[in-house]
């Protein structure tokens, strides 16, 4: 072949780096906007995929999370890192669901295919 395949790896790496700035999902925990650039004070991303089979949409304003929507692929316990702020979680009907706090982690049960909305506590 006359074309070097290596430049495409750089493109994939750049895309992965941007994704890691917006969403991390290590150790079974979801971490929203862990390294949001100051140059992006508001925005949204839809259709992100996290480990453990989550689909995630993120919305942010003034450099902070305003809403995250999580759709799990399987029934499971979901863990969200809260960082400095605290979150609430609502189901598809808008009803707040029971969560337990474990340090900076917020844990709650999710059902496959249902949408859960995470918002900052006011």
Which residues does each predicted region cover?
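Short, small-residue-biased leader/transition segments that mark boundaries at the very start
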Residues: 1-6
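Catalytic cores of secreted or luminal carbohydrate-active enzymes
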Residues: 8-57, 61
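Surface-exposed coil/turn segments at beta-strand junctions on protein surfaces, enriched
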Residues: 49, 73, 101, 109-111
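Short, well-ordered beta-strand segments enriched in hydrophobic/aromatic residues
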Residues: 56-58, 65-72
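Generic recognition of long tandem-repeat/solenoid scaffolds
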Residues: 67-70, 105-109
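Surface-exposed beta-strand/loop patches in extracellular or lumenal glycoproteins
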Residues: 69-85
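Solvent-exposed beta-strand/loop surfaces of large extracellular or lumenal domains
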Residues: 86-108
């Amino acid at each position: 072949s006359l074309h070097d395949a290596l430049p495409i790896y750089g493109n994939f790496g750049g895309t992965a780096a941007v994704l890691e700035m917006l969403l991390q999902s290590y150790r079974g925990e979801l971490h929203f906007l862990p390294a949001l650039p100051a140059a992006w004070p508001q925005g949204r991303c839809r259709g992100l995929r996290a480990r453990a089979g989550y689909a995630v949409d993120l919305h942010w304003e003034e450099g902070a999370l305003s809403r995250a929507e999580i759709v799990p692929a399987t029934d499971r316990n979901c863990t969200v890192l809260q960082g400095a702020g605290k979150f609430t979680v609502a189901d598809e009907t808008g009803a707040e669901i029971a969560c337990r706090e474990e340090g900076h982690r917020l844990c709650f049960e999710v059902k496959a295919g249902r949408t859960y909305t995470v918002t900052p506590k006011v």
